[in-house]
Swiss-Prot record:
Biased composition (Basic and acidic residues): 17-29
Organism: Arabidopsis thaliana (Mouse-ear cress)
Keywords assigned by UniProt, alphabetized: Kelch repeat, Repeat
Residues covered by region (Disordered): 1-32
A Pfam family of this chain: F-box
Keyword Repeat (UniProt): yes
Domain of life: Eukaryota
Kelch repeat segments: 144-175, 176-221, 222-267, 269-313, 315-359
Designated name of the protein: Putative F-box/kelch-repeat protein At2g21680
Length: 429
């Protein structure tokens, strides 16, 4: 098991830790350490009750007050979960192709200058989490993120950048892919579990088959993984039991697969897994009934893209086809099998944010969109690179129409290099 905890820049691994401090400073630090180790006059139970009411964004500051507070932080998460004092936290996987590793980021939400009813948003890098293999499948469950499969190889390194040439856990199993790819590339069967409470990760049992760009969904406490390879074995669908921590195969028959059996995107609605393959055909799997349904055309396949999310069993998607005509978001109802427009949205940015990479996520019932934007400042190559965050609340009226309200629009990251938002997802901590 690999276990890595986040450390500060001035930790013991820094380059100056061998420099001897003056004796006066050592004595002062020793006295301060003895002082903070004294038992607090307030009972621990009472301190925990007070901490339960503190927003998670302030926990790092609290843990630095003294060692006693730091030790209480680990107990705090379980109590918050038990009492229902949880928060939604947005994680993003941001790439900097082709010169720098992609990295995990967390969206920090803090009161702006301690002013009431004001929130400052900022994407902060998480150094303790490793980059993912290209083509990995990602699902979130509670406070956990699961990274499944992917593809590695030297040719892939040249095509998409330095961050995608290694599996997270070292690549225990894989297969070389030549047809439909490049010699030297290989799919992997690795599975990694990320604990978002403490930003730690560990390896889980590998899948039976190596996969890349598979579809996945969580239903009844189990992770179903579909495709990511051609339909030619009995292991085209596998299921991971979270309690038993083991994989098993789901028997066929399977639907007719097109191309390499890989998928552009996927979603879970009404406890069914919807998959959009590379030729824009829809495959729907019902795990409870062990039934498949496939569409070769229709409204869903025509407008669905990988920048989408599901809220209340409805599929929300950026409407790229008519974005500049005032209808930036569409909603697909799986029961009525039709699309609706999200009306309202005064204040939605109209400066071409969605020309390049962007991702949408369900944030506690609201919509959050992260978009990498490049503004040309001059006639030549000088550009201002930004990642924007748009938060949207929405409701369904009695007449069946959908209305949205833009709650905030903010720049959350201004990197020095061109960026792309590869993944955007929410966990509960």
């Amino acid at each position: 098991m690999v276990l890595i905890s986040e450390t500060s820049d001035d930790g013991s691994t820094g380059g100056d830790h061998q420099i001897k401090k003056p004796k006066k400073e050592e004595d002062r630090n020793k006295k301060l350490k003895e002082k903070v180790q004294v038992s607090l006059p307030i009972p621990e139970e009472l301190i925990l009750r007070c901490f339960l009411l503190v927003r998670r964004c302030h926990h790092p500051s609290l843990s630095l007050v003294c060692r006693s507070f730091h030790s209480l932080m680990s107990k705090l998460y379980d109590d918050r979960l038990r009492l229902g004092y949880t928060e939604n936290v947005l994680y993003a996987y941001v790439g900097f192709p082709p010169v720098e590793n992609p990295s995990w980021y967390i969206l920090h939400r803090k009161p702006y200058r301690n002013l009431p009813n004001t929130i400052s948003l900022k994407l902060c890098k998480i150094d303790s989490l490793p980059p993912m293999p290209w083509g990995s499948t990602v699902v979130t469950i509670g406070s956990d993120i699961y990274v499944i499969g992917g593809r590695v190889g030297e040719k892939l390194l040249e095509d998409v950048g330095v961050g995608y040439n290694k599996p997270i856990s070292g690549g225990r199993r894989g297969e070389t892919s030549i047809r439909g790819g490049h010699a030297g590339e290989r799919r992997i069967s690795d599975v990694t579990h990320i604990n978002c409470r403490f930003h730690e990760y560990r390896s889980l049992p590998s899948m039976k088959m190596a996969r890349c760009r598979a579809a996945a969904g969580v239903i009844d406490g189990k992770i179903y993984v579909i495709g990511g390879r051609k339909v030619r074995t009995s292991d085209w669908v596998e299921v991971f039991d979270l309690k038993k921590q083991s994989w098993s195969s789901v028997p066929g028959p399977y639907p007719e697969a097109f191309g390499r059996g890989e998928f552009l995107t996927y979603a879970v609605m009404k406890e069914k897994i919807y998959c959009l393959d590379l030729t824009r055909n829809i495959h729907i799997y019902d795990p409870k009934e062990s039934k498949w349904e496939s569409w070769t055309h229709g409204p869903l396949s025509a407008s669905w893209n990988d920048s989408s999310c599901v809220v209340d069993n409805l599929l929300f998607c950026i409407n790229t086809s008519v974005y500049f005509l005032g209808w930036p978001i569409k909603i697909y109802d799986p029961e009525k099998k039709t699309w609706f427009y999200l009306q309202g949205l005064q204040g939605f940015p109209a400066n071409g944010l969605f020309v390049d990479g962007y991702k949408m996520a369900n944030f506690g019932g609201k919509l959050v969109i992260l978009s990498a934007d490049v503004h040309r400042l001059r006639r030549y190559d000088c550009r201002k690179r930004e990642i924007w965050c748009i938060e949207i609340a929405w409701e369904r009226k009695e007449d069946g129409t959908f209305w949205g309200k833009v709650e905030s629009v903010a720049v959350v990251l201004t990197p020095a290099k061109t960026t792309s938002v590869d993944i955007c997802g929410t966990v509960t901590v």
